[in-house]
């Protein structure tokens, strides 16, 4: 492994960066231009891991300037979202409420008559000052963040409805701001720097809303369209790309939104076909500007994972960890990724160590972390498990008591973990079969491991050993048919990524033929139909691919991880129906 700096040696560029911002004077007045300049300084500090210094710049004017209010509250909201501590969430909500009040003071005041007239004829840009236009954008951003925190804070239905209304209001404001910007373009009024900054805000909001809404399964989107929402993926991406290529304060936010889409959404909620070339191109200038920025390093490492460069990713995650000590939550994100990195390589002992760190330090999803730790330990020989001092059965029995609710709903992966853990509730527990590899599949990790044929072959060997063990059991348990189907699904996925499509098809069909024997893991059937559909897509049989994926969509309901599969189905069908497969793809 290459040497990773412990943080005591710093580049001259970084020291120069700190010197430049060390003695930033407090402004005596704060107009829009000055606010944007000062908030840009704060943003640069934030991206260079100087989180407290960024807050110190923003705090003095947080109740007097819309951009200071937005920046200050956004950092606190990010912090609360990562810690999940109730007091941090409450602080984030309180600060965001103050930010909304600040933005409200700068918004155009309208009478009842003016408000009614605007329903018929939207107000033009001439009716708003530049400051009022920016106040609208900042208000919409604050409203969206407050709605998100409202869901996290309390699970009651009233808060859920309030949060939904805030999101809808935010969406409507963005649409109106987009109309204002379009009008300004036609009138040739977009030359000033502040107008370009407004443009950046519009592209971020409209782009993010369109992109995220386009990801939703059609049945959900139809309902949202009824109440005024709409989402166009290509339009959303184009808006974010334009925003990312600009020089506004929100350019980096457009970049981070695109990076999150390419490196997480496309993998976990999509088919795994991420545009990593664009992700690398977007990140490159920021890696040069902030070579030790933890957020930038994190995404660089994530891209390495998705490219199958696990060893390089591990080094970059370690660099990210030592780059700053103020926000430990970024360390937790790295631990999560490192856990998967080692799992993909079947280095289960190292994977366990990172799962254990998450259990001890992070509050995000204790049920998931404890289940993950127990699942990983289950892959190790008994003598190695003893050296850790852990009790696998006791860990699985803890899971149900750690489950939490957000916005009144249980977290799907936690519900899945609880259901799987119930095998260990009885006095005579029945061991789970390949639980860590099952979780790799749940998180769509085989699309990542599949980039490395050597590792995929190793995983296949592990699966086939489990298959032989199950087939030779003399006293099979009631879970035996489910376990056999799980093994066939995992085996089929490995074979598919190795290009052995006929063998993979046999495995998937074996699961489908065993449908009536499955007692507990009913999710295996729709997921298998989905995988079979993707296999036919790889073979170039578009019609058959659509038919099998539609079967997964329409013929099954009320199974574990249903929403996650529907997101993936939506992505797969959009790809198939939007761009017909003309030639068979080359197996990777």
Swiss-Prot record:
The gene coding this protein: ttc39b
Primary role: May be involved in lipid metabolism.
SUPFAM superfamilies listed in its UniProt record: TPR-like
Source species of the chain: Xenopus tropicalis
Family to which this protein belongs: Belongs to the TTC39 family.
BP GO terms, sorted: lipid metabolic process
Protein name stated in the entry: Tetratricopeptide repeat protein 39B
One Pfam family named in its UniProt record: Iml2-TPR_39
Cross-referenced InterPro entries: Iml2/TPR_39, TPR-like_helical_dom_sf, TPR_rpt
Alphabetical keyword list: Lipid metabolism, Repeat, TPR repeat
Repeat region (TPR), residues: 294-327, 485-518, 526-559
């Amino acid at each position: 492994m290459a040497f990773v700096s412990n943080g005591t040696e710093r580049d001259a560029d970084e020291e120069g960066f700190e010197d430049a911002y060390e003695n930033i004077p407090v402004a005596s007045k704060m107009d829009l231009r000055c606010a944007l300049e000062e908030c840009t300084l704060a943003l640069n500090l934030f991206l260079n891991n100087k989180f407290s210094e960024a807050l110190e710049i923003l705090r003095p004017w947080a109740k007097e300037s819309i951009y200071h209010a937005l920046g200050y509250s956004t950092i606190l909201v990010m912090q609360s979202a990562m810690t999940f501590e109730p007091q941090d969430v409450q602080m984030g909500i309180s600060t965001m409420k103050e930010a909304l009040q600040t933005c409200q003071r700068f918004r155009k005041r309208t009478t009842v008559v003016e408000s009614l007239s605007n329903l018929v004829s939207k107000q033009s840009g001439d009716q708003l000052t530049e400051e009022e236009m920016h106040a609208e954008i900042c208000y919409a951003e604050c409203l969206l963040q407050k709605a998100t925190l409202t869901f996290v804070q309390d699970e009651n239905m009233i808060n859920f409805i309030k949060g939904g209304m805030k999101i809808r209001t935010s969406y409507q404001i963005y649409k109106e701001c987009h109309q204002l910007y379009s009008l300004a373009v036609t009138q040739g009024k977009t030359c000033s720097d502040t107008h370009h900054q407004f443009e950046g805000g519009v592209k971020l909001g409209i782009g993010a809303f369109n992109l995220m809404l386009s990801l939703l399964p059609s049945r959900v989107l139809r309902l949202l369209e009824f109440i005024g929402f709409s989402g166009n993926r290509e339009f959303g991406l184009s808006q974010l790309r334009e925003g990312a290529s600009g020089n506004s304060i929100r350019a980096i936010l457009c970049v981070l939104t695109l990076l999150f889409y390419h490196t997480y959404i496309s993998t976990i909620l999509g088919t795994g076909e991420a545009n990593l070339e664009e992700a690398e191109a977007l990140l490159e200038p920021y890696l040069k500007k902030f070579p030790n920025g933890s957020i930038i390093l994190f995404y660089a490492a994530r891209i390495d994972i998705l490219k199958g460069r696990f060893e390089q990713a591990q080094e970059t995650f370690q660099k990210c960890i030592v780059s700053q000590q103020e926000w430990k939550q970024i360390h937790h994100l790295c631990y999560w990724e490192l856990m998967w990195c080692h799992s993909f390589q079947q280095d289960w002992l190292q994977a366990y160590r990172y799962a254990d760190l998450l259990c001890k330090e992070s509050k995000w999803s204790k049920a998931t972390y404890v289940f993950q730790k127990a699942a990983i330990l289950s892959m190790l020989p008994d003598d190695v498990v003893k050296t850790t001092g852990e009790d696998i059965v006791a860990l699985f029995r803890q899971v149900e008591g750690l489950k939490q609710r957000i916005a009144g709903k249980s977290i799907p992966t936690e519900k899945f973990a609880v259901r799987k853990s119930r095998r260990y509730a009885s006095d005579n527990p029945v061991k789970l079969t390949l639980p860590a590899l099952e979780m790799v599949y749940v998180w769509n990790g085989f699309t990542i491991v599949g980039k490395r044929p050597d590792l995929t072959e190793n995983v296949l060997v592990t699966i086939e050993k489990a298959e032989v063990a199950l087939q030779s059991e003399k006293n099979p348990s009631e879970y035996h048919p489910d376990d056999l189907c799980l093994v066939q699904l995992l085996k089929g996925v490995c074979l598919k990524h190795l290009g052995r499509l006929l063998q993979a098809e046999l495995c998937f069909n074996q699961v489908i033929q065993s449908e009536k024997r499955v007692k507990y893991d009913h999710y295996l059937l729709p997921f298998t139909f989905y995988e079979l559909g993707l296999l036919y897509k790889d073979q170039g049989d578009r019609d058959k691919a659509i038919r099998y994926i539609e079967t997964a969509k329409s013929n099954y309901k009320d199974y574990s991880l249903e929403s996650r599969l529907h997101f993936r189905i939506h992505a797969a069908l959009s790809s198939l129906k939007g761009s017909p497969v003309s030639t068979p793809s080359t197996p990777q």
